[in-house]
UniProtKB/Swiss-Prot annotation:
Keyword Lipid biosynthesis: yes
Domain notes: The last Arg residue of the ACP-binding site is essential for the weak association between ACP/AcpP and FabH.
Keywords: Acyltransferase, Cytoplasm, Fatty acid biosynthesis, Fatty acid metabolism, Lipid biosynthesis, Lipid metabolism, Multifunctional enzyme, Transferase
Record protein name field: Beta-ketoacyl-[acyl-carrier-protein] synthase III
Catalytic activity: malonyl-[ACP] + acetyl-CoA + H(+) = 3-oxobutanoyl-[ACP] + CO2 + CoA
Gene Ontology MF, one: 3-oxoacyl-[acyl-carrier-protein] synthase activity
Family assignment from sequence similarity: Belongs to the thiolase-like superfamily. FabH family.
Organism listed in the record: Chromobacterium violaceum (strain ATCC 12472 / DSM 30191 / JCM 1249 / CCUG 213 / NBRC 12614 / NCIMB 9131 / NCTC 9757 / MK)
Entry EC number(s): 2.3.1.180
Subunit structure: Homodimer.
Length: 319
């Protein structure tokens, strides 16, 4: 049984930027209120005509170019998203068509903000088992479409974007260890409860979140799974070069870093400029740090995140 490693990274952000000051013109809030509670200063918003697959395509093309491979070498496409183009088919199938890769196995993973670590773990298993050789793994979201823009508790938090990696076969370990978890008992704390029935949308079509409860659970669960992932991989905390966390809340990120004994200058933070982009946030942050030279080949990196469900997980890798 072989290994897998990341061959290339890519990302895409819509050009439209929505600042806290602009939001304050719409709802009762302020830049100070948002920054003090979340760390967010701005977020990117997709154009009205764009779909999740459009953002995914741009990130995928960048990752393929970064990997230095021909797109025809890709034999698996996984898209992590909670804002698909449509109910079905999968956004991965739509992306496959846009990439011009007919016949390549393609499917979506839905674990909300933990979607990318779930998708990357799945792609790693496919490659290690011989079911794929080169996988395109994408996290893409247009969260702005599921927000109630009159609810200041949630509309200030999220943004749109996409990030991607190409994962390929390797003789040396790249993905060192992955650990996933979920607990459906907490589904009511973070959800979008709408469904289609009888030709109509039934239920509330906007994101709902019990912020304090989510914060409390996230701090505890992320610290525990990050520690367990290192222990099960046999890697000391001191050997960890970078933490690339889901970009949800600066205080949650700081808590996990403190638990791991990492200074914040070893944590990739894109939250202030991008907000919470759900499944896209981890690959977006990873690509930023790869492109600016912070994350380099041979370094030990942990990716971790939590989303509605709750579902959470961590991936430890050598970049």
């Amino acid at each position: 049984m072989g290994y897998s490693r990341i061959l290339g990274t890519g990302s895409f952000l819509p050009s439209q930027v929505l600042t806290n000051a602009q939001l304050a013109e719409r709802v009762e809030t302020s830049d100070e209120w948002i920054v003090s509670r979340t760390g967010i200063r701005a977020r990117h918003i997709a154009d009205e005509g764009h779909k999740t697959s459009d953002l995914a395509l741009r990130a995928a093309q960048a990752a393929i170019a970064s990997a230095g491979i021909d797109k025809g070498e890709i034999d698996l496409i996984i898209v992590a998203t909670t804002t698909p183009d449509m109910v079905f088919p999968s956004t991965a199938c739509i992306l496959q068509e846009k990439l011009g890769l007919p016949g390549v196995q393609a499917f979506d993973v839905q674990a909300v903000c933990a979607g990318f670590v779930y998708a990357l773990t799945t792609a790693n298993a496919y490659i290690k088992s011989g079911l794929a050789k080169k996988a395109l793994v994408v996290g893409a979201e247009i969260m702005s479409r599921v927000l109630d823009w009159d609810d200041r508790r949630t509309c200030v938090l999220f943004g749109d974007g996409a990030g991607a990696v190409v994962l390929g076969e390797s003789d040396e370990p790249g993905i060192l260890h992955a650990k996933l978890a979920a607990d459906g008992r907490y589904q009511g704390l973070l959800n979008t409860p709408a469904q289609i029935s009888g030709g109509k949308i039934q239920g509330i079509p906007y994101l709902h979140m019990d912020g304090p409860a989510v914060f409390k659970f996230a701090v505890k669960s992320l610290s525990e799974i990050a520690t367990a992932t290192l222990a099960e991989a046999g890697v000391e905390q001191a050997s960890l070069d970078w933490l690339v966390p889901h970009q949800a809340n600066l205080r949650i990120i700081e808590s996990t870093a403190k638990h791991l004994g990492l200074p914040m200058d070893k944590v990739v933070v894109t939250l202030p400029e991008q907000g919470n982009t759900s499944a896209a946030s981890i690959p977006l942050a990873l690509d930023v740090a790869v492109r600016d030279g912070r994350i380099r080949r041979g370094q030990t990196v942990m990716l971790e995140g939590i989303g509605g469900g709750f579902a959470w997980g961590a991936v430890l890798l050598t970049f």
